[in-house]
Amino acid sequence: METVSPEFVIGGAERLLRVSAVSLTATAAELREESGAWLADPVVGVSRAALGVILDDVTGYVVAAGAPSNRWPVSLGIRLDLLGEPPIDGSVLTAAGRLIARDDTSGTTRGEVVAADGSVLALITQRSHLLTVSEVPTTPYIDVPVPGPEVSLREALALREVEPGVVELPANPYAANGMGNIHGGVLITGMEFAAMSALGAAGELRATSIDTAFVRPADARRSTTFAARVRHRGRSVSVVEVTATGGAGKPCGIATVMVRPAPEAE
């Protein structure tokens, strides 16, 4: 069946995180992202999970580029290994993704994002499932101005701590992907914020891995709640389970978040 190289869809999440395409093929892809002070946060320190947007895209689009023209990939699971601190100085980050395996219904991809100095900040493994679609996603029109660089990620997404360990993401066009659902990378970011809230973090902890299963789409036009449960708390490592529940009251994502002290706090 015919395959068509997809347009890189600049959804709300891509605009918010300043993500752009360099190259997209059925075997490899490269994207870029502008860093900035919006990644800093008083609770999570610097949002490492926000790298999930570019990493989800750079691996997911490899599967999309090799899929039949009436199929589109959605993520079943993403594992992020978060190795370093995203810079906040305006430097450009580069992400690369590559195909590991593909069949008629799914694809597996891996990738990484590196800083301008060549240091690896994060790794991803993604498993995707192909859906039959009447038309592939296209770049949506958003009539709300993109938040400026002085607006933090927490503020731009209007993330709100309901109580310790419970964080709410209201309806927000800048949380969405091209299909109108909450972007996988934004869901992962919510997982990070909820996990840190449950631990009572104040900038001294960092997420080192986030392993997320996506069990159903989350409509970006409705609120999503992230509820965290601490499974282990220790001086060297803590483990938190986070469940994201969509507006229909059903889980849309379940994650295990591993947290360690920030390097300067060890």
Predicted segments, located by residue:
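Non-catalytic linker/capping segments at the edges of enzyme domains
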Residues: 1-38, 125-174
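The feature marks the first
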Residues: 15-16, 20-27, 33-38, 49, ...
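Short coil/loop residues immediately preceding or within conserved phosphate-binding loops
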Residues: 16, 77, 108, 209, ...
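Hot-dog-fold acyl-thioester-processing enzymes
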Residues: 30-63, 169-197
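Preference for bulky hydrophobic residues occupying beta-strand positions
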Residues: 33, 78-81, 111, 169, ...
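Hydrophobic beta-strand-centered segment that forms part of the acyl-chain substrate-binding groove
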Residues: 43-46, 60-94, 99, 195-225, ...
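HotDog/MaoC-like acyl-thioester-processing domains
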Residues: 61, 73, 86-148, 216-221, ...
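Structured core of small recognition/catalytic domains
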Residues: 167-253
